[in-house]
């Protein structure tokens, strides 16, 4: 399902909600375009906003009653750029800041129903996210994260006992090194 197609997304979620017991929603889709902000085009900005912020908010809204009933969890994959300057990626960083801010407020709204809201903020990981950038992660292993390391952080947060919520985890490699492609 194209998560930027709101009508199709809502129809798909209704089917899932009808046929499955939903206890965890993972908002993991993401897209990034990098470069000077003045050089981005409106379509790229719109795609980032719709994918990184709007779709997770709509998915969460569509499933929130079910998650409240099931005392479920919303798990958001944000980015370290949510809380720091991100030159050559300011629109991407803004969408992730929006997602992280949404998660903080949502937790305060739904915690009394037993719903957990968790945000993982990974730094540069060895994924295809940077395929559109003129840079990539450093060559040495300590300069990037592996996707499974981000998954381990999520698993840690999800494994906590009932009544304890790890609301935010930031995961960074030891070194901050990038290189030009």
Tell where the protein language model's regions lie, with residue ranges.
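The beta1-alpha1 cofactor-binding region of Rossmann-like NAD(H)/NADP(H)-dependent oxidoreductases
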Residues: 1-11, 42
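Substrate-binding pocket helix/loop in short-chain dehydrogenase/reductase
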Residues: 36-37, 44-46
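Residue(s) in the substrate-gating loop at a strand-loop-helix junction
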Residues: 79
């Amino acid at each position: 399902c194209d998560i930027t197609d709101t009508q199709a997304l809502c129809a798909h979620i209704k089917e899932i909600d009808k046929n499955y017991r939903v206890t965890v929603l993972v908002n993991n889709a993401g897209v990034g375009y990098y470069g000077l902000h003045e050089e981005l085009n409106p379509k790229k900005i719109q795609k980032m906003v719709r994918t990184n912020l709007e779709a997770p908010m709509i998915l969460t809204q569509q499933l929130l009653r079910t998650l409240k009933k099931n005392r479920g969890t919303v798990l958001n994959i944000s980015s370290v750029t949510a809380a720091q300057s991100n030159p050559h990626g300011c629109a991407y960083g803004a969408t992730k800041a929006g997602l992280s801010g949404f998660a903080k407020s949502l937790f305060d709204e739904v915690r009394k129903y037993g719903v957990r809201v968790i945000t993982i903020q990974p730094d540069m990981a060895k994924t295809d996210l940077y395929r559109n950038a003129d840079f990539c992660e450093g060559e040495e292993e300590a300069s990037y994260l592996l996707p499974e390391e981000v998954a381990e952080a999520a698993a840690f947060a999800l494994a906590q006992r009932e009544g304890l919520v790890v609301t935010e985890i930031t995961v960074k490699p030891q070194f901050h090194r990038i290189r030009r492609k």
